[in-house]
């Protein structure tokens, strides 16, 4: 039995065929060929590096004059291994995964499928290549022969012997990371495994990428170019994979299902991230603060807290942001867009968080509870301010008189005493006020609105303080000090001006 070579599992294209592939299919081809070579290398079958791999590593076209002539002269001489062929003829599950993991459901229409296979099937030499894959992969499961210099194991003694000859002929280089001996031709590849070499760098922000295709996609963040357009809704995307995911919004397709909770996802990466919720795995760790994250994108965002990087810039005002979501929200200030609408009252909001807070007005939901006194609040900020009543903390201090306050809003109001600022102006008569509630009460003089009604006699008033004064005519209550002043029934202000 002859040894399996890279040519047995390679896909070769003529220039005409290569031009028929789009950029995504060309990237897929590069990734699959490099991975196939990597698998042969790990099995000890890649004795020499093929020209095709050299071309792909240098990001050149995967053909030259010699290959072009060979393909033209022998059209059946190059095997066209595709996911469809591998599945149809059941070559081997392990080998199929190498292709399927990269190609997924991609439909490479330009590859010659069944016709080529039928034509190649008549050739005994090519059939032996398929059989060679079977025999090689079956044999490597046991891996009975291991070479102590480099640690590689082999299922076939003939391959093991051939591998030993290579080390006897060539000078070996020892990897400092794992201690393996490598030939010079493979030493760079071995180093990249440990260092995760990122050779493509963005000139705008300095970000490094492993692949040139990743750098091309990243550059679109800066240029704003979105060449991939959805035919359904017209939305555009920077990369083809994002468009593929988006299309599933229209089709409702969720092909990736969690075996634990049966939740389905539109893309495989989302399922992988979701599984970590069940396993508790957090493989991405910050070197600065050692905080761990479930997905790489979360770690990337987190790192900006330490570096201060703000890669997302507003074209209108030049303000920069750490995250693209923050930029998207900021842009609504310029556009006036308010996409979040309350179903109860129809009021629109710029941010989803504001809508969630607003909904509590209709629901009377008070999710934040004080552990000291049991009082509940609609908003967390109100609970935080309330807790300071128990702790006595007053972190907001006036620089003019030294008076301190429990919340920042009270300090802002207090500062107006020193500044004599009256920021609230009546549009009807031009009168100004220090406090917004005073302006609200004043406006009712012009509108005639009297929302505060006495339950005893039915008389109505423009402000809550007037109602409180009136109620005393029924009760006969005459407070003589500020301590005896009752709190307003219809508002949140404390009555301070009654003597």
From Swiss-Prot:
One GO BP annotation of this record: regulation of DNA-templated transcription
Keyword Zinc-finger: yes
GO cellular component: nucleus
Domain KRAB: 4-75
Record has Iron as a keyword: no
Localization annotation: Nucleus
Keywords: DNA-binding, Metal-binding, Nucleus, Repeat, Transcription, Transcription regulation, Zinc, Zinc-finger
ZnF (C2H2-type) ranges: 143-167, 200-222, 228-250, 256-278, 284-306, 312-334, 340-362, 368-390, 396-418, 424-446, 452-474
A GO molecular function held by the record: DNA-binding transcription factor activity, RNA polymerase II-specific
InterPro entries: KRAB (IPR001909), KRAB_dom_sf (IPR036051), Snail/Krueppel_Znf (IPR050527), Znf_C2H2_sf (IPR036236), Znf_C2H2_type (IPR013087)
Superkingdom as given in the UniProt entry: Eukaryota
Pfam family for this entry, one: zf-C2H2_4
Function recorded in the entry: May be involved in transcriptional regulation.
PANTHER family in UniProt: GENE, 32687-RELATED, ZINC FINGER PROTEIN
Family in the record: Belongs to the krueppel C2H2-type zinc-finger protein family.
Protein name per Swiss-Prot or TrEMBL: Zinc finger protein 727
Organism field: Homo sapiens
Chain's gene name: ZNF727
């Amino acid at each position: 039995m002859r040894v399996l070579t890279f040519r047995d599992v390679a896909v070769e294209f003529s220039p005409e065929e290569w031009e028929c592939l789009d950029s995504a299919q060309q990237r897929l081809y590069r990734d699959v060929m490099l991975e196939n070579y990597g698998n042969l290398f790990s099995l000890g079958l890649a004795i020499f590096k093929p020209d095709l791999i050299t071309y792909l590593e240098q990001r050149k076209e995967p053909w030259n004059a010699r290959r072009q002539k060979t393909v033209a002269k022998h059209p059946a001489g190059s095997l066209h291994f595709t996911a469809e062929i591998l599945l149809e003829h059941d070559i081997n599950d392990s080998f199929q995964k190498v292709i399927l993991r990269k190609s997924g459901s991609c439909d490479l229409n330009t590859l010659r499928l069944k016709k080529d296979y039928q034509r190649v099937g008549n050739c005994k030499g090519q059939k032996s290549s398929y059989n060679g894959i079977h025999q090689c992969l079956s044999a490597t499961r046991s891996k009975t022969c291991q070479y102590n210099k480099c640690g590689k194991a082999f299922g076939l003694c003939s391959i093991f012997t051939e591998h030993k000859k290579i080390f006897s002929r060539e000078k070996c280089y020892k990897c400092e990371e794992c201690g393996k001996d490598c030939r010079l031709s493979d030493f760079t590849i071995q180093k990249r495994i440990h260092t995760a070499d990122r050779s493509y760098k963005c000139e705008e922000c300095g970000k490094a990428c492993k692949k040139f295709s990743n750098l091309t996609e990243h550059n679109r963040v800066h240029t704003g170019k979105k060449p991939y357009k959805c035919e359904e809704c017209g939305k555009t995307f920077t990369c083809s994979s994002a468009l593929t995911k988006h299309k599933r919004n229209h089709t409702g397709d969720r092909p990736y299902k969690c075996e634990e909770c049966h939740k389905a996802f539109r893309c495989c990466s989302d399922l992988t991230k979701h599984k970590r919720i069940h396993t508790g795995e957090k493989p991405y760790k910050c070197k600065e603060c050692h905080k761990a994250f479930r997905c790489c994108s979360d770690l990337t965002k987190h790192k900006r807290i330490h570096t201060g990087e703000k890669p997302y810039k507003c074209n209108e005002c030049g303000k920069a942001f750490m995250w693209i979501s923050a930029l998207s929200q900021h842009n609504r200030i310029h556009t006036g867009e308010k996409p979040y609408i309350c179903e109860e009252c129809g009021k629109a909001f710029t941010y989803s968080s504001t809508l969630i807070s607003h909904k509590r007005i209709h629901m009377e939901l008070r999710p934040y509870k004080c552990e000291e006194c049991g009082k509940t609040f609609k908003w967390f900020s109100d609970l935080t301010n309330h807790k300071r009543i128990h702790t006595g903390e007053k972190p907001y201090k006036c620089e003019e008189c030294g008076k301190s306050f429990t919340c920042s809003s009270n300090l802002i109001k207090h500062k107006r005493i020193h500044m004599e600022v009256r920021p609230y102006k009546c549009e009807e008569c031009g009168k100004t006020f220090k406090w917004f509630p005073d302006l609200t009460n004043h406006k009712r003089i012009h509108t005639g609105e009297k929302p505060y009604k006495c339950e005893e006699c039915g008389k109505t008033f423009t402000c809550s303080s007037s109602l409180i004064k009136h109620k005393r005519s029924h009760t006969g209550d005459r407070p003589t000090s500020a301590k005896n002043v009752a709190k307003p029934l219809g508002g949140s202000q404390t009555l301070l001006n009654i003597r």
